[in-house]
Design a protein with these regions (language model features):
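Bacterial N-terminal signal peptides
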Residues: 3-16
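Glycine-rich, acidic and aromatic/proline-enriched surface loops and short helix-turn segments
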Residues: 97-101, 248-256
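A cross-kingdom feature marking solvent-exposed beta-strand/loop segments within repeated
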Residues: 101-123, 256-272
Length: 292
């Protein structure tokens, strides 16, 4: 009898663990719709700047910059206007290298520099598989967007943590787990020092100052914005903020004193972050060298 009960308990534990197990598509859903915030660029918005959820990922914001004019493309599995005809390997290459497949109307053409392939390069193989599984599962929507116009060669500044990569040992450390999330979330793409189209990740990591004019990453009609200093500097950055204040800014878009954060800050996506992931992100931000 005791043996039977013990076996039953083991079976119940196994069933419980299986019930909690996350499928690749679920993991992809979590990454795409939280820290990576893919819909922030790739989903259309209404006249009030609100996401049109029933048209998610069918093409979104237009970026009109000195180097290029590009509309975030349709990444639904529609075969004609989206990525439905792309192989898994081609989707992964677009993510981590920023290059389209060698077939179709735009064969081999680089994706615009706003696509953060220099950050996505850090994605772990299992996470890449998960993202592809999720994108395959979203509703296909027929929607052709305008072709990109390039005024200069596409360039992406190497991001140190993405170049170094993340081994499995890194995930035992909350700070390194946070670094991975901040990397694939391309937070420092906006929040690092920026000059003449070049990011300064070496001496300006997290210092902010990048200016986003109204047509560079903001919904139609929205004002421009300037990325904030997110280093732990006590006055210029977030060093004096509590963990709760940092968490609220990330997930609600509200800073200390009630200041509302502006686009392209993707707090509506970050609101779904797991508490553990949010804590790791904060731990990493606390570890960044303070800059003024």
């Amino acid at each position: 009898m005791l043996r039977f009960c013990f076996v039953c308990c083991l079976w119940l534990v196994a069933v419980s663990n299986a019930a909690r197990a996350e499928s690749p598509a679920e993991r992809g859903d979590y990454l795409v719709n939280t820290i990576m915030a893919c819909g922030n660029c790739h989903s259309p918005r209404d006249a009030n700047g609100q996401l049109i959820r029933e048209k998610a990922f069918s093409g979104g914001l237009t970026f009109d910059t000195p180097a290029f004019v590009a509309t975030a493309p349709n990444i639904t599995p529609d075969r004609e206007t989206g990525i439905g005809s792309w192989s898994d390997a081609e989707i992964k290459r677009a993510l981590v290298e920023g290059v389209r497949p060698n077939h179709g109307r735009l064969a081999g053409v680089a994706l615009a520099a706003i696509m953060p392939a220099n950050f996505y390069k850090a994605l772990l193989p299992d996470d890449l598989d998960a993202i592809v599984a999720y994108l395959r599962a979203v509703k296909p929507i027929r929607n052709a967007v305008a072709d990109s116009v390039y005024k200069a060669a596409v360039r992406r500044d190497p991001y140190p943590d993405a170049e170094a990569g993340f081994g499995s040992a890194a995930f035992a450390d909350p700070v390194r787990r946070g670094a991975y999330l901040v990397t694939i979330g391309h937070c420092m793409e906006c929040h690092s020092a920026w000059s003449k189209g070049t990011s300064d990740f070496k001496t300006g990591l997290g210092r902010g100052g990048r200016v986003f004019p109204p047509r560079e990453g903001s919904p139609e009609g929205a004002p421009g914005s300037t990325a904030s200093n997110i280093t732990p500097h006590p006055t210029a950055g977030i060093g004096a903020w509590t963990d709760r204040e940092i968490a609220r800014a990330i997930t609600e878009g509200v800073g200390p004193g009630g200041r509302t954060l502006k686009p392209p800050m993707a707090y509506i996506y970050y609101a779904r972050l797991k508490e553990t992931d949010l804590a790791d992100i904060i731990a990493y931000l606390r570890s960044v060298p303070p800059l003024q």
